[in-house]
């Protein structure tokens, strides 16, 4: 049962969130994309957005297409896998995925 709900990240505006992953520091890694909205340049939106545990934007990994899902993997848990409609991208990051 959830309680004390609050807005952490506002997705209002152009673009939309998709898959989400968390790292061991509590940062939120979100797949993001333009969603084909008129007048929106997808090159500015497509990729992965990283937020602090308090919801502050920290980084944007740009991809040539919308990131539909993502997860951490690799031997040390510091490789970010990003899936889109046509491609799978992977990059080593200075973070480790949270253990489930």
Where are each of the predicted segments found?
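Short loop/turn segments immediately following beta-strands, especially the blade-tip
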Residues: 1, 92-100
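Blade-edge beta-strand/turn elements of extracellular beta-propeller
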Residues: 1-12, 48-63
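Beta-rich, blade/repeat-based domains predominating
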Residues: 6, 11-32, 64-79, 85
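Short glycine/acidic-enriched loop and turn motifs that connect beta-strands
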Residues: 35-38, 87-89
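Short, solvent-exposed loop/turn segments at conserved positions within beta-propeller repeat blades
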Residues: 37-45
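Structural signature of WD-repeat beta-propellers
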Residues: 43, 83-84
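A short loop-to-beta-strand structural motif that recurs across blades of beta-propeller domains
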Residues: 46-49, 87
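Hydrophobic/aromatic beta-strand positions that recur at structurally equivalent sites within the blades
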Residues: 50-51, 91-93
